[in-house]
Amino acid sequence: MDRIVSSSHDRTSLLSTHKVLRNTYFLLSLTLAFSAITATASTVLMLPSPGLILTLVGMYGLMFLTYKTANKPTGIISAFAFTGFLGYILGPILNTYLSAGMGDVIAMALGGTALVFFCCSAYVLTTRKDMSFLGGMLMAGIVVVLIGMVANIFLQLPALHLAISAVFILISSGAILFETSNIIHGGETNYIRATVSLYVSLYNIFVSLLSILGFASRD
């Protein structure tokens, strides 16, 4: 009897996990599309950058709001507000590359981001490997990157900036592996939180690839 109950529970848990994964990918596709629209509008209208302080307040404020409302219907609205804002602040960055004739760099960064996401997701979904061991390493990597970013505010070293971008790509790729594994193993049951986590990883990979490829093109 216990085996029957256990087997039934496992199947229910697996179906629930798959549902979270499907909902996550669906919402992720919608937020990416919305972010692309706001980024395009920001680029075409040549909207100015909101500045460092407003960017940080808007980004972390909306992220906090999204996580706070993740279990409510308003969480979806918060997720779109967050991703839309990041799309808006991406516009001035894209204009910098377009004005320098680096449209091909943007295309390569998009392609590279899609490839990284596909490979990381496919690996976890195929192997179903538990990636929870990455948690500590990812946190340590984030701390190192933050220290490097603060240091480079004063040092202004191009080599350090490139190194930070490269590490950001590695950390974000690891975060995709970690979050996808967390979803399929039932560690993350909220698709809104999962969506935001994957979106931020994709955003960081794209911006970091832009930085690296743009630097290489200038040389």
Swiss-Prot record:
The terms under GO molecular function for this entry are:
calcium channel activity
Q: Which residues lie on this side of the membrane: Cytoplasmic?
A: 1-22, 65-73, 126-132, 179-195
Q: Which InterPro entries match?
A: Bax_inhbtr1_CS, Bax_inhibitor_1-related
Q: What happens when the gene is disrupted?
A: No effect on SecY degradation.
The question of whether Cell cycle is a record keyword is answered with: no
PROSITE patterns to which the protein is assigned, alphabetical: BI1
Membrane-crossing segments per the record: 23-43, 47-64, 74-94, 105-125, 133-153, 158-178, 196-216
* Posttranslational modification: YccA is processively degraded by FtsH; degradation initiates via the approximately 20 residue N-terminal tail in a sequence non-specific manner. The deletion mutant yccA11 is resistant to FtsH-mediated degradation, probably because it is too short to be degraded by FtsH.
The main place the protein resides is: membrane
Instruction: Note the CDD domains from the entry.
Output: YccA_like (cd10433)
> Which family does the record assign?
Belongs to the BI1 family.
Q: What is this protein called?
A: Modulator of FtsH protease YccA
The protein's organism comes out as: Escherichia coli (strain K12)
